[in-house]
Regions:
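An N-terminal boundary/leader segment
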Residues: 1-58, 288, 458-464
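Glycine-aromatic micro-motifs
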Residues: 421, 447-452, 456-606
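A short helix-breaking turn/cap at a secondary-structure junction
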Residues: 194-277, 281, 300, 444-472
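Short glycine/serine-rich loop segments
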Residues: 106-232, 408-431
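Conserved small-residue hinge/capping positions at short loops/turns
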Residues: 70-93, 119-122, 126, 131, ...
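Serine-dependent amide/ester hydrolase catalytic core
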Residues: 15-21, 125, 254, 267, ...
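Short helix-loop capping/hinge segments that flank enzyme active sites or metal/cofactor-binding pockets
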Residues: 74-96, 253-262, 312-366, 418-427
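Acyltransferase
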Residues: 24-31, 61, 271-297, 321-327, ...
Length: 606
């Protein structure tokens, strides 16, 4: 059940979940395949902790027995997690044995993955304390690059990226403070999604720079990465840096798209002519797809990048390990120790001076994006061998951050996408960057670009799946989810029809909602999102209204009803009916019915 299974086996999340739902493959078989591939890959440096196979398969079998299993967006998908993110059943080491601890609960991101049907199989290697873009700074070894073994795997999320690239699992979590979710994606020919700051909770993450940290996603396709993001996205009271941002939906490739490219002479490739040529070919591809390329001044972005390690943000890294630096300095990788120790020497004056300059640079970035939808840059300017990096660890690592270090300081979202495979067997990728909140736009255009390259995914030589057109409504139409009397054939459905509403589909929520019957006359339902694992999937319908009709409809909704964001079983998000929690004291929990229609049918016969 190893690599010889070839292209006929489902490799992407979408294909694996579809096979589980169809019954052509069981979650237990998928887990067994992952473990066999791990054995065949024979690289002990990928995982710091690996779950016992029998235990993981037992969980897969238990999951498959659930009545709602098929509705879960990540039904039976094996997932690995970077070992600076807490996951129950595994120690968290941050690649430093002296720092290791046993978490008492899942990080919020892992909790949401499990609730969506994912099965966590292990914790992956990283540059110690997530400090580095190279993947060689770990006492647990250097993971093999999945494309060319002489190349660095990229970091700091080295194990997570190589695990996806090698086909061991279709989804992993990384982190991204300075490029750790993007550089290793390029070097392993996979997709790396760095969401907007605060979109995925960092509760349960060992910080690198707490104000800049993101949990990131590695996957084989943009659609897979976007699905994983939709499962994890959302505010979290446990994370003071969490932000409640609409995720948005993947849309068709826009009719007009303006992409920013640096002015002539501003790009730096450090003499790598093949990378420079590959970037030029990528720009030609964007033009052929219909994008307009607009030059912008990259120098303010370079200046911002220099602030990350030359400015006070290195003090955040120092705060994480200052006690360990004092008590057991030899337990810290020498390069990591050298970088972080500098944080102790920074002053408050240094900090405020840098913050003032950063604010000015942010204003420049805002003006840049005033007439540009997104930037398109090389993910990294070259690819180094492990031998080169070990001989010159700090300078070459710094070079790899040329196009990544400024991103979180400027509050941008990013999507790293494979662009080409060079003649020398080195993968090349581009990164799309946009202001926070434009994650869906990047996914919408990035998926089309990746598909157009016709590249195989990862290192397995498997073709990309056919690109599925995103669901579309009419121009100026807004989808809305209804769960009660507005359902087809029920008492208030006429309100939607009177506004020329159109039924799009009948589906279910993700499995983290409860449904209540409110003590009103006539009876009304109230749906509420609850803690992961404590709810169920609720039946609903999605209708489409024009924006003006949507406004009229929402304006007429009486308290305690409200419109909020609802996660669907397939991972999408849509606006729909929710209830204010304060009125649920005397309400009846009717979640077990699975929907309002079934509850009302039984009530009518009582």
């Amino acid at each position: 059940m190893g690599a010889e299974m070839g292209a006929e086996q489902p490799e992407t999340i979408a294909a694996i979940v579809a096979a589980h739902r169809a019954g052509t493959l069981t979650p237990a078989q998928t887990l067994a395949r992952s473990y066999q591939r791990i054995r065949d890959h024979n690289d002990p440096a990928v995982f710091i902790s690996l779950r016992d196979e029998k235990d993981a398969i037992a969980e897969a079998e238990k999951l498959a027995a659930r009545a709602d299993a098929a509705s879960l967006p990540l039904y039976g998908v094996p997932v690995a997690v970077k070992d600076n993110i807490d996951a129950l059943g595994f120690p968290t080491t941050a690649a430093c044995p002296a720092f290791s601890y046993t978490p008492t609960h899942d990080s919020t991101a892992v909790e949401r993955l499990r609730a969506a049907g994912a099965i966590i199989i292990g914790k992956t290697n990283l540059d110690q304390f997530a400090t580095g873009l190279v993947g060689v700074r770990s006492p647990y070894g250097i993971p093999k690059n999945s494309i060319r073994e002489d190349l660095i795997p990229g970091g700091s999320s080295s194990g997570s990226a190589t695990a996806v690239g090698a086909g061991l699992v279709p989804l992993t979590l990384g982190t991204d403070t300075a490029g750790s979710g993007r550089v290793p994606a390029m070097l392993n020919n996979i997709v790396g999604l760095k969401p907007s700051l605060g979109m995925i909770s960092t509760a349960g993450l060992v910080p690198a720079c707490r104000t800049l940290d993101c949990i990131s996603v590695f996957a084989l396709t943009v659609d897979d990465a976007a699905l994983a993001l939709s499962v994890m996205a959302g505010p979290d009271q446990a994370d003071p840096f969490s932000r409640d941002r609409p995720l948005g939906a993947i849309t068709p490739f826009p009719a007009t798209l303006r992409l920013g490219v640096p002015r002539n002479g501003q790009l730096i490739f450090f003499g790598d002519r093949k990378a420079e040529a590959a970037y030029g070919e990528a720009l030609k591809r964007w033009t052929a797809l219909g994008a307009t390329l607009v030059e912008f001044d990259l120098e303010p972005f370079y200046e911002t990048a220099r602030l990350l390690y030359e400015g006070p943000w290195v003090a955040e890294r120092y705060l994480v390990i200052k006690n360990l630096l004092a008590s057991a300095p030899d337990s810290i990788h020498p390069v990591t120790r050298e970088i972080t120790a500098a944080g102790a020497r920074l002053t408050a004056a240094d900090t405020f001076s840098a913050l003032y300059r950063l604010q000015g640079l942010r204003k420049i970035a805002e003006r840049t994006f005033a007439n540009i939808d997104a930037l398109v840059l090389p993910t990294a300017q070259t690819a180094y061998t492990t031998a080169q990096v070990l001989a010159n660890p700090i300078e070459l690592n710094s070079r790899l951050g040329t196009y990544t270090n400024f991103v979180n300081l400027l509050d941008l979202c990013g999507l790293a996408v494979p662009a080409s495979m060079r003649a020398d067997g080195v993968p090349f990728g581009i990164t799309l960057l946009a202001p926070a909140g434009r994650d869906a736009l990047l996914a919408s255009i990035g998926r089309v670009f990746h598909a157009d390259t016709k590249l195989t995914v990862g290192a397995k030589g498997v073709a990309q799946p056919a690109l599925t057109p995103p669901a579309t409504g009419g121009i100026d139409e807004i989808p809305i989810a209804v769960v009660g009397a507005h359902l087809s054939g029920m008492a208030l459905n006429g309100e939607l029809k009177a506004l020329n509403g159109k039924l799009i589909e009948a589906t279910r929520t993700a499995a983290d909602y409860k449904l209540y019957a409110l003590p009103t006359t006539p009876p009304k339902p109230g749906m509420l999102r609850v803690e992961a694992g404590k709810g169920s999937a609720i039946e609903l319908e999605i209708w489409s209204l024009s924006s003006s009709a949507f406004g009229k409809f929402v304006n007429a909704i009486p308290a305690p009803m409200a419109i909020g964001t609802i996660r669907l079983a397939d991972g999408r998000s849509v606006k729909g009916f929710l209830v204010e929690p304060a009125v649920l004291g005397e309400a009846r929990d009717i979640t077990a019915y699975g929907g309002w229609r079934k509850y009302m049918a039984e009530a009518a016969t009582a």
